Amino acid sequence: MQTSEREGSGPELSPSVMPEAPLESPPFPTKSPAFDLFNLVLSYKRLEIYLEPLKDAGDGVRYLLRWQMPLCSLLTCLGLNVLFLTLNEGAWYSVGALMISVPALLGYLQEVCRARLPESELMRRKYHSVRQEDLQRVRLSRPEAVAEVKSFLIQLEAFLSRLCCTCEAAYRVLHWENPVVSSQFYGALLGTICMLYLLPLCWVLTLLNSTLFLGNVEFFRVVSEYRASLQQRMNPKQEEHAFESPPPPDVGGKGGLMDSTPALTPTEDLTPGSVEEAEEAEPDEEFKDAIEETHLVVLEDDEGAPCPAEDELALQDNGFLSKNEVLRSKVSRLTERLRKRYPTNNFGNCTGCSATFSVLKKRRSCSNCGNSFCSRCCSFKVPKSSMGATAPEAQRETVFVCASCNQTLSK
Protein backbone atom coordinates (compact mmCIF):
# COMPACT_ATOMS: atom_id res chain seq x y z
CA MET A 1 0.00 0.00 0.00
CA GLN A 2 2.63 2.46 1.01
CA THR A 3 4.63 1.54 -2.00
CA SER A 4 1.68 2.11 -4.29
CA GLU A 5 0.89 5.40 -2.60
CA ARG A 6 4.46 6.52 -3.03
CA GLU A 7 4.35 5.48 -6.64
CA GLY A 8 1.05 7.24 -7.12
CA SER A 9 2.19 10.41 -5.42
CA GLY A 10 5.57 10.41 -7.10
CA PRO A 11 4.68 12.51 -10.12
CA GLU A 12 2.44 14.87 -8.14
CA LEU A 13 4.19 17.97 -6.77
CA SER A 14 3.03 20.53 -4.33
CA PRO A 15 2.13 23.90 -5.82
CA SER A 16 4.59 25.64 -3.55
CA VAL A 17 7.54 23.62 -4.83
CA MET A 18 8.20 24.37 -8.50
CA PRO A 19 10.91 22.64 -10.49
CA GLU A 20 13.82 24.88 -11.29
CA ALA A 21 14.17 25.57 -14.98
CA PRO A 22 17.54 24.56 -16.39
CA LEU A 23 19.71 27.64 -16.69
CA GLU A 24 20.69 28.25 -20.30
CA SER A 25 24.36 28.93 -20.63
CA PRO A 26 25.04 32.24 -22.42
CA PRO A 27 26.28 31.68 -25.94
CA PHE A 28 29.96 32.25 -26.40
CA PRO A 29 30.72 35.24 -28.64
CA THR A 30 31.70 34.02 -32.05
CA LYS A 31 35.17 35.10 -33.03
CA SER A 32 35.05 37.52 -35.94
CA PRO A 33 37.21 36.51 -38.86
CA ALA A 34 40.52 38.31 -38.95
CA PHE A 35 41.03 40.78 -41.80
CA ASP A 36 44.26 40.30 -43.71
CA LEU A 37 45.11 43.21 -45.96
CA PHE A 38 47.80 41.28 -47.76
CA ASN A 39 45.31 38.55 -48.74
CA LEU A 40 43.11 41.31 -50.14
CA VAL A 41 46.03 42.54 -52.22
CA LEU A 42 46.70 39.03 -53.49
CA SER A 43 43.05 38.63 -54.46
CA TYR A 44 43.19 41.93 -56.29
CA LYS A 45 46.33 40.82 -58.14
CA ARG A 46 44.66 37.58 -59.15
CA LEU A 47 41.62 39.50 -60.36
CA GLU A 48 43.90 41.72 -62.44
CA ILE A 49 45.45 38.65 -64.02
CA TYR A 50 42.06 37.14 -64.82
CA LEU A 51 40.86 40.38 -66.39
CA GLU A 52 44.10 41.03 -68.27
CA PRO A 53 42.72 39.90 -71.68
CA LEU A 54 39.74 42.24 -71.31
CA LYS A 55 42.09 45.08 -70.35
CA ASP A 56 44.25 44.43 -73.42
CA ALA A 57 41.18 44.38 -75.64
CA GLY A 58 39.98 47.68 -74.16
CA ASP A 59 43.40 49.25 -74.72
CA GLY A 60 43.33 48.13 -78.35
CA VAL A 61 39.86 49.61 -78.90
CA ARG A 62 40.91 52.92 -77.30
CA TYR A 63 44.05 52.94 -79.45
CA LEU A 64 41.92 52.67 -82.59
CA LEU A 65 39.32 55.22 -81.47
CA ARG A 66 42.00 57.79 -80.61
CA TRP A 67 43.44 57.57 -84.13
CA GLN A 68 47.00 56.89 -82.98
CA MET A 69 47.54 55.19 -86.36
CA PRO A 70 45.16 57.04 -88.71
CA LEU A 71 45.41 54.55 -91.56
CA CYS A 72 44.67 51.57 -89.32
CA SER A 73 41.73 53.35 -87.66
CA LEU A 74 40.27 54.36 -91.04
CA LEU A 75 40.53 50.82 -92.41
CA THR A 76 38.92 49.41 -89.25
CA CYS A 77 36.01 51.86 -89.46
CA LEU A 78 35.37 51.15 -93.13
CA GLY A 79 35.77 47.39 -92.69
CA LEU A 80 33.28 47.24 -89.82
CA ASN A 81 30.76 49.32 -91.76
CA VAL A 82 31.06 46.99 -94.74
CA LEU A 83 30.61 43.93 -92.52
CA PHE A 84 27.56 45.41 -90.78
CA LEU A 85 25.89 46.20 -94.10
CA THR A 86 26.71 43.02 -96.04
CA LEU A 87 26.55 40.13 -93.55
CA ASN A 88 23.25 38.25 -93.34
CA GLU A 89 21.85 36.27 -90.44
CA GLY A 90 23.75 33.06 -91.23
CA ALA A 91 27.03 34.92 -91.54
CA TRP A 92 26.48 36.52 -88.15
CA TYR A 93 25.97 33.10 -86.58
CA SER A 94 29.20 31.92 -88.20
CA VAL A 95 31.08 34.93 -86.83
CA GLY A 96 29.70 34.24 -83.34
CA ALA A 97 30.79 30.59 -83.49
CA LEU A 98 34.24 31.67 -84.66
CA MET A 99 34.57 34.15 -81.79
CA ILE A 100 33.73 31.38 -79.31
CA SER A 101 35.90 28.64 -80.77
CA VAL A 102 39.09 30.67 -81.27
CA PRO A 103 39.54 31.70 -77.59
CA ALA A 104 38.68 28.16 -76.49
CA LEU A 105 41.31 26.68 -78.81
CA LEU A 106 43.94 29.21 -77.73
CA GLY A 107 43.28 28.53 -74.04
CA TYR A 108 43.54 24.76 -74.55
CA LEU A 109 46.83 25.06 -76.45
CA GLN A 110 48.26 27.40 -73.82
CA GLU A 111 47.41 24.99 -71.00
CA VAL A 112 48.81 21.98 -72.85
CA CYS A 113 52.07 23.64 -73.88
CA ARG A 114 52.75 25.43 -70.59
CA ALA A 115 55.74 24.12 -68.64
CA ARG A 116 55.38 23.21 -64.95
CA LEU A 117 57.97 25.12 -62.96
CA PRO A 118 59.39 23.82 -59.65
CA GLU A 119 59.46 25.81 -56.44
CA SER A 120 63.08 26.89 -56.87
CA GLU A 121 62.41 28.24 -60.35
CA LEU A 122 59.38 30.14 -59.08
CA MET A 123 61.44 31.77 -56.33
CA ARG A 124 64.15 32.69 -58.84
CA ARG A 125 61.62 34.31 -61.17
CA LYS A 126 59.79 36.09 -58.38
CA TYR A 127 60.84 39.53 -59.60
CA HIS A 128 58.93 38.93 -62.84
CA SER A 129 55.14 39.00 -63.08
CA VAL A 130 53.67 35.97 -61.31
CA ARG A 131 50.69 34.00 -62.57
CA GLN A 132 47.53 32.66 -60.91
CA GLU A 133 48.84 29.78 -58.84
CA ASP A 134 52.24 31.40 -58.35
CA LEU A 135 50.68 34.13 -56.21
CA GLN A 136 49.77 31.56 -53.57
CA ARG A 137 53.07 29.70 -53.64
CA VAL A 138 55.64 32.49 -53.69
CA ARG A 139 56.52 34.08 -50.34
CA LEU A 140 57.16 37.81 -50.39
CA SER A 141 59.42 39.63 -47.98
CA ARG A 142 58.07 42.30 -45.66
CA PRO A 143 59.26 45.31 -47.74
CA GLU A 144 57.78 43.74 -50.87
CA ALA A 145 54.48 43.11 -49.09
CA VAL A 146 54.36 46.70 -47.80
CA ALA A 147 55.06 48.01 -51.30
CA GLU A 148 52.27 45.84 -52.74
CA VAL A 149 49.82 47.08 -50.11
CA LYS A 150 50.73 50.72 -50.78
CA SER A 151 50.34 50.26 -54.52
CA PHE A 152 46.94 48.63 -54.00
CA LEU A 153 45.73 51.46 -51.75
CA ILE A 154 46.86 54.07 -54.27
CA GLN A 155 45.03 52.31 -57.10
CA LEU A 156 41.94 51.86 -54.92
CA GLU A 157 41.91 55.55 -54.04
CA ALA A 158 42.21 56.54 -57.71
CA PHE A 159 39.41 54.15 -58.70
CA LEU A 160 37.10 55.45 -55.97
CA SER A 161 37.84 59.05 -56.98
CA ARG A 162 36.96 58.33 -60.61
CA LEU A 163 33.81 56.49 -59.52
CA CYS A 164 32.72 59.41 -57.32
CA CYS A 165 33.29 61.89 -60.15
CA THR A 166 31.23 59.72 -62.52
CA CYS A 167 28.37 59.43 -60.03
CA GLU A 168 28.40 63.17 -59.41
CA ALA A 169 28.22 63.85 -63.15
CA ALA A 170 25.31 61.40 -63.51
CA TYR A 171 23.43 63.05 -60.64
CA ARG A 172 23.96 66.48 -62.21
CA VAL A 173 22.41 65.23 -65.44
CA LEU A 174 19.49 63.51 -63.72
CA HIS A 175 18.74 66.51 -61.48
CA TRP A 176 18.89 69.00 -64.37
CA GLU A 177 21.61 71.11 -62.75
CA ASN A 178 22.81 71.92 -66.28
CA PRO A 179 19.72 72.08 -68.51
CA VAL A 180 21.72 72.01 -71.74
CA VAL A 181 23.56 68.78 -70.89
CA SER A 182 20.41 67.12 -69.51
CA SER A 183 18.38 68.02 -72.59
CA GLN A 184 21.13 66.64 -74.84
CA PHE A 185 21.25 63.40 -72.84
CA TYR A 186 17.50 62.76 -72.89
CA GLY A 187 17.27 63.84 -76.52
CA ALA A 188 19.98 61.33 -77.44
CA LEU A 189 18.08 58.58 -75.59
CA LEU A 190 14.83 59.37 -77.41
CA GLY A 191 16.64 59.56 -80.73
CA THR A 192 18.25 56.17 -80.11
CA ILE A 193 14.88 54.59 -79.34
CA CYS A 194 13.34 56.06 -82.50
CA MET A 195 16.32 54.93 -84.56
CA LEU A 196 16.07 51.38 -83.21
CA TYR A 197 12.37 51.31 -84.07
CA LEU A 198 12.61 52.80 -87.57
CA LEU A 199 15.93 51.53 -88.97
CA PRO A 200 17.20 47.96 -89.45
CA LEU A 201 19.77 46.65 -87.01
CA CYS A 202 22.58 46.69 -89.59
CA TRP A 203 22.10 50.42 -90.20
CA VAL A 204 21.95 51.08 -86.47
CA LEU A 205 25.28 49.32 -85.97
CA THR A 206 26.80 51.20 -88.90
CA LEU A 207 25.70 54.57 -87.52
CA LEU A 208 26.97 53.67 -84.05
CA ASN A 209 30.35 52.60 -85.41
CA SER A 210 30.69 55.74 -87.54
CA THR A 211 29.79 57.93 -84.56
CA LEU A 212 32.41 56.29 -82.36
CA PHE A 213 35.18 56.66 -84.94
CA LEU A 214 34.28 59.97 -86.62
CA GLY A 215 32.56 61.86 -83.81
CA ASN A 216 35.42 62.20 -81.32
CA VAL A 217 37.91 65.01 -80.85
CA GLU A 218 40.93 62.98 -81.94
CA PHE A 219 39.50 62.51 -85.44
CA PHE A 220 39.15 66.28 -85.93
CA ARG A 221 42.69 66.75 -84.61
CA VAL A 222 44.06 64.31 -87.20
CA VAL A 223 42.04 65.98 -89.97
CA SER A 224 43.38 69.42 -89.02
CA GLU A 225 46.97 68.11 -88.98
CA TYR A 226 46.62 66.54 -92.42
CA ARG A 227 45.01 69.72 -93.75
CA ALA A 228 47.90 71.81 -92.45
CA SER A 229 50.45 69.43 -94.00
CA LEU A 230 48.65 69.57 -97.36
CA GLN A 231 48.63 73.35 -97.27
CA GLN A 232 52.36 73.35 -96.61
CA ARG A 233 52.95 71.05 -99.58
CA MET A 234 50.68 73.05 -101.89
CA ASN A 235 52.09 76.48 -100.99
CA PRO A 236 55.78 76.07 -100.12
CA LYS A 237 56.86 79.21 -102.00
CA GLN A 238 54.66 81.56 -100.01
CA GLU A 239 56.11 80.33 -96.73
CA GLU A 240 59.67 80.72 -98.05
CA HIS A 241 58.96 84.33 -99.06
CA ALA A 242 57.38 84.96 -95.67
CA PHE A 243 60.48 83.66 -93.87
CA GLU A 244 62.92 85.45 -96.20
CA SER A 245 61.24 88.89 -95.98
CA PRO A 246 63.78 91.30 -94.38
CA PRO A 247 62.85 93.37 -91.36
CA PRO A 248 61.96 97.04 -91.97
CA PRO A 249 65.08 99.27 -92.02
CA ASP A 250 65.66 101.70 -89.20
CA VAL A 251 65.08 105.35 -89.89
CA GLY A 252 68.43 107.11 -90.26
CA GLY A 253 70.28 104.03 -89.05
CA LYS A 254 69.76 104.97 -85.42
CA GLY A 255 67.52 102.11 -84.38
CA GLY A 256 70.37 99.68 -83.83
CA LEU A 257 72.26 102.14 -81.70
CA MET A 258 69.21 102.90 -79.63
CA ASP A 259 68.50 99.20 -79.04
CA SER A 260 72.11 98.41 -78.12
CA THR A 261 72.45 101.16 -75.52
CA PRO A 262 71.04 100.19 -72.12
CA ALA A 263 68.33 102.32 -70.58
CA LEU A 264 69.53 104.46 -67.73
CA THR A 265 67.58 104.26 -64.49
CA PRO A 266 68.54 107.23 -62.30
CA THR A 267 66.58 105.86 -59.36
CA GLU A 268 68.95 102.91 -58.89
CA ASP A 269 71.23 102.80 -55.88
CA LEU A 270 74.77 103.02 -57.28
CA THR A 271 76.69 103.26 -54.04
CA PRO A 272 79.80 101.06 -53.80
CA GLY A 273 78.20 98.86 -51.14
CA SER A 274 75.14 98.10 -53.27
CA VAL A 275 77.28 97.46 -56.36
CA GLU A 276 79.43 95.00 -54.42
CA GLU A 277 76.34 93.22 -53.08
CA ALA A 278 75.03 92.89 -56.63
CA GLU A 279 78.36 91.46 -57.79
CA GLU A 280 78.38 88.96 -54.93
CA ALA A 281 74.77 87.89 -55.49
CA GLU A 282 75.10 87.55 -59.25
CA PRO A 283 77.08 84.25 -59.39
CA ASP A 284 74.68 82.64 -56.89
CA GLU A 285 71.66 83.37 -59.10
CA GLU A 286 73.07 81.77 -62.25
CA PHE A 287 72.01 78.14 -62.65
CA LYS A 288 73.10 77.39 -66.19
CA ASP A 289 74.71 74.29 -67.59
CA ALA A 290 78.46 74.29 -67.61
CA ILE A 291 78.52 73.43 -71.31
CA GLU A 292 76.36 76.43 -72.23
CA GLU A 293 78.46 78.64 -69.97
CA THR A 294 81.65 77.40 -71.67
CA HIS A 295 80.26 78.19 -75.13
CA LEU A 296 79.19 81.65 -74.04
CA VAL A 297 82.61 82.36 -72.53
CA VAL A 298 84.42 81.16 -75.67
CA LEU A 299 82.23 83.33 -77.89
CA GLU A 300 82.78 86.35 -75.69
CA ASP A 301 86.55 85.76 -75.63
CA ASP A 302 86.62 85.49 -79.44
CA GLU A 303 84.96 88.89 -79.76
CA GLY A 304 87.83 90.42 -77.84
CA ALA A 305 87.77 92.82 -74.93
CA PRO A 306 88.91 96.44 -75.29
CA CYS A 307 92.10 97.52 -73.66
CA PRO A 308 91.66 98.87 -70.12
CA ALA A 309 93.88 101.84 -70.86
CA GLU A 310 91.77 102.76 -73.90
CA ASP A 311 88.63 102.51 -71.75
CA GLU A 312 90.09 104.87 -69.17
CA LEU A 313 91.10 107.38 -71.85
CA ALA A 314 87.69 107.20 -73.48
CA LEU A 315 85.99 107.82 -70.15
CA GLN A 316 88.26 110.76 -69.35
CA ASP A 317 87.95 112.39 -72.78
CA ASN A 318 84.18 112.12 -72.90
CA GLY A 319 82.95 115.18 -71.02
CA PHE A 320 79.25 114.50 -71.56
CA LEU A 321 79.07 111.59 -69.11
CA SER A 322 77.84 112.32 -65.62
CA LYS A 323 79.31 110.84 -62.47
CA ASN A 324 76.64 108.12 -62.23
CA GLU A 325 77.14 107.17 -65.87
CA VAL A 326 80.90 106.86 -65.36
CA LEU A 327 80.33 104.64 -62.33
CA ARG A 328 77.82 102.52 -64.25
CA SER A 329 80.23 102.03 -67.14
CA LYS A 330 83.00 101.00 -64.75
CA VAL A 331 80.73 98.48 -63.04
CA SER A 332 79.64 97.03 -66.38
CA ARG A 333 83.27 96.67 -67.53
CA LEU A 334 84.24 94.92 -64.29
CA THR A 335 81.26 92.58 -64.60
CA GLU A 336 82.15 91.73 -68.20
CA ARG A 337 85.73 90.96 -67.20
CA LEU A 338 84.49 88.66 -64.46
CA ARG A 339 82.17 86.83 -66.85
CA LYS A 340 84.80 86.48 -69.58
CA ARG A 341 87.19 84.56 -67.36
CA TYR A 342 87.34 81.04 -68.70
CA PRO A 343 86.31 78.58 -65.94
CA THR A 344 88.69 75.74 -65.12
CA ASN A 345 85.88 73.25 -64.47
CA ASN A 346 83.92 72.66 -67.66
CA PHE A 347 81.49 70.15 -66.21
CA GLY A 348 79.79 72.27 -63.54
CA ASN A 349 81.75 71.00 -60.53
CA CYS A 350 83.36 72.81 -57.65
CA THR A 351 87.10 73.39 -58.11
CA GLY A 352 87.80 72.55 -54.47
CA CYS A 353 85.59 69.58 -53.56
CA SER A 354 84.34 68.55 -57.07
CA ALA A 355 80.71 68.80 -55.95
CA THR A 356 78.16 69.14 -58.75
CA PHE A 357 76.37 72.46 -58.82
CA SER A 358 72.61 72.39 -58.42
CA VAL A 359 69.80 74.44 -56.93
CA LEU A 360 70.92 73.47 -53.44
CA LYS A 361 74.66 73.54 -54.14
CA LYS A 362 75.04 77.06 -55.51
CA ARG A 363 77.93 78.31 -57.61
CA ARG A 364 80.11 81.11 -56.22
CA SER A 365 83.06 82.73 -58.01
CA CYS A 366 86.20 83.71 -56.19
CA SER A 367 86.69 87.49 -56.36
CA ASN A 368 90.46 87.07 -56.71
CA CYS A 369 91.10 84.14 -59.08
CA GLY A 370 87.65 83.95 -60.70
CA ASN A 371 87.28 80.16 -60.44
CA SER A 372 83.95 78.55 -59.60
CA PHE A 373 83.48 77.08 -56.13
CA CYS A 374 80.60 76.00 -53.96
CA SER A 375 79.45 78.21 -51.10
CA ARG A 376 81.38 76.09 -48.58
CA CYS A 377 84.75 76.24 -50.37
CA CYS A 378 84.39 79.94 -51.20
CA SER A 379 83.30 81.19 -47.79
CA PHE A 380 86.34 83.26 -46.74
CA LYS A 381 85.83 87.01 -46.56
CA VAL A 382 88.71 89.43 -47.08
CA PRO A 383 88.65 93.23 -47.31
CA LYS A 384 88.87 94.81 -50.71
CA SER A 385 91.99 96.65 -49.69
CA SER A 386 93.93 93.36 -49.59
CA MET A 387 93.37 93.01 -53.37
CA GLY A 388 94.78 96.47 -54.15
CA ALA A 389 91.71 98.67 -53.81
CA THR A 390 92.58 102.16 -52.52
CA ALA A 391 89.13 103.63 -51.99
CA PRO A 392 88.21 104.57 -48.40
CA GLU A 393 85.29 102.13 -48.47
CA ALA A 394 87.65 99.25 -49.39
CA GLN A 395 88.86 99.06 -45.79
CA ARG A 396 85.44 97.92 -44.50
CA GLU A 397 83.93 96.22 -47.55
CA THR A 398 84.59 92.47 -47.86
CA VAL A 399 84.38 89.99 -50.72
CA PHE A 400 84.31 86.18 -50.95
CA VAL A 401 87.50 84.33 -51.91
CA CYS A 402 88.60 80.69 -51.93
CA ALA A 403 90.92 79.07 -49.38
CA SER A 404 94.12 79.36 -51.44
CA CYS A 405 93.48 83.00 -52.28
CA ASN A 406 92.67 83.66 -48.64
CA GLN A 407 96.06 82.30 -47.58
CA THR A 408 97.81 84.34 -50.28
CA LEU A 409 96.03 87.58 -49.46
CA SER A 410 96.35 87.17 -45.68
CA LYS A 411 100.17 87.02 -45.78
From Swiss-Prot:
Q: Which top-rank group of organisms is this from?
A: Eukaryota
Q: Which UniProt keywords apply?
A: Cell membrane, Cell projection, Endoplasmic reticulum, Endosome, Membrane, Metal-binding, Phosphoprotein, Transmembrane, Transmembrane helix, Zinc, Zinc-finger
Task: Tell me the segments the record calls region Necessary for interaction with KIF5A.
Answer: 271-361
For whether the record's keyword set contains ATP-binding, the answer is: no
- InterPro entries in the cross-refs: Protrudin, Znf_FYVE, Znf_FYVE-rel, Znf_FYVE_PHD, Znf_RING/FYVE/PHD
Using the UniProt annotation, give all residue ranges assigned to the region (Sufficient for localization to endoplasmic reticulum tubular network and for interactions with REEP1, REEP5, ATL1, ATL2, ATL3 and SPAST): 1-205
Region described as Necessary for interaction with RAB11A and function in neurite outgrowth: spans on this chain: 51-64
**UniProt-listed SUPFAM superfamilies:** FYVE/PHD zinc finger (SSF57903)
Q: Where does Zn(2+) 2 bind?
A: C366, C369, C402, C405
Cytoplasmic compartment spans: 1-66, 110-187, 209-411
Where is the region Necessary for interaction with VAPA?
286-292
Q: Where are the zinc fingers (FYVE-type)?
A: 344-410
Keyword Zinc in the entry? The reply is yes
- PTM comment for this protein? Phosphorylated. Phosphorylation is induced by NGF through the MAPK/ERK pathway and modulates interaction with RAB11A.
Which Gene3D superfamilies does the record match to this protein? Answer: Zinc/RING finger domain, C3HC4 (zinc finger) (3.30.40.10)
Intramembrane region(s): 188-208
Describe its membrane topology.
Answer: Multi-pass membrane protein
The record ties this protein, via PANTHER family, to: PROTRUDIN
Protein name per UniProt:
Protrudin
